[in-house]
Amino acid sequence: MIELDFGSIGLAVTNWIIIAALVVTLLVSLRKTQSVDLLPVPVSQELKGLAILAIVFAHISYMLVTDNHFLYPLSIAAGVGVDIFLFMSGFGLTVGMLKKRMPAMEFYRRRLIKVFIPLWVVLILLFAVDAVFLQHYYAPLYMLQSLLGWFPRAAAFDDVNSPFWYISWLLMFYILFPLLFMPQRPWLTAILLAVIANIVAVTDPLDLQVDWLHRLHTNAFSLGMIVAWALRESKGSRNPLVEKLKAFRDGGAPLVRYLLLLVLALVAGYLACHNNASDWPHLAQALHAARFDESFFIGQATSLLTMAALIVIFSLKRMEFKFLYLFGVYSFETYLLHWPLMARYDVFFHHLPAWLAPLIWLPAFIAIGWLLQKITTPLGAWFDKHI
């Protein structure tokens, strides 16, 4: 871990400089939205951008540096970020399946191209550069398991990339989704997936070191499916719920909408800051008496409620944050590479002021993500043509 030197300005001022720089960047990138849908692609990308930033900041604060007050409060919502990714995945897959049913094998082929091609490129790169520059050699079985998407643990400095635990968890949903999907009852598929995910996480049949992370993220994917089902519109008919929400967003009561957005933002901020059982002692006591695991229940509930508030905010706002959109476009690439780059090959935190290092890493992730897409996109097209 890196011990930061905050110099004469101190930790608090360092955090405020970073926050101010990000706020200015967000405001400069603000544009009037061109979309009319509630959850169009630009909004999805903005949410993914927000999610990956929350994850990156948390990994810096709680894993990379010794002082976990660094980047507070930007660093407290990694779990919310993971839930946003799972929610958007469930939402997007359900929207696609409701428009055009896809056979299971075709679904798997497309997931293989979208997820595994970038994953394989990054893994091969990391295995090679770690061996050449760090003389760190991974066991053949470990490399094979990684290439198959199996990451049963999340050891920050021992695994090739500890955040890859998410890949294995996501693959479970991907494997089950086309097998259980019911076009007339996607809500039932969502419930079945949530039940399976909770059973797997609670029973932990394989006794996985990473299960504590699985238990915090069992329901977001299914919630995305349910929202997609609730907002779907059939040919020749309009969805009354969608029409009411659009009318509220675009209608003549902006003050009410602004007040709602403000309240939701405050709720999201409060829940993100109070996400432990110790923050809700009476609820924790009641859950414990009912033989629920209060830590996981409260941790997941506050994360999902925070996520829900943010999704409503982004759906009802009439402006776009191009900065978040850009990070959303390269969110998967940033996810794949940010931790090993910072943990093993960092130069910025070691040689730059603490306030400047994360502000340099962020555009670096965009540039690296752009480069990785330039490599993986033609590879994916080749696989799509020949497989």
What are these regions (language model features)?
Residues 1-196, 330, 350-387:
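Membrane-cytosol interface segments of multi-pass membrane proteins
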Residues 59, 93, 126-130, 201-202, ...:
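Structural signal for membrane-spanning alpha-helices in multi-pass inner-membrane proteins
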Residues 169, 216-220, 302-306:
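Hydrophobic alpha-helical segments and helix-packing faces
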Residues 4-18, 44, 48, 54, ...:
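Aromatic-enriched alpha-helical transmembrane segments of multi-pass intramembrane proteins
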Residues 62-64, 130, 213, 229, ...:
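Active-site environment of divalent metal-dependent phosphoester hydrolases
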Residues 7-22, 79, 87, 122, ...:
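Alpha-helical transmembrane segments of multi-pass integral membrane proteins
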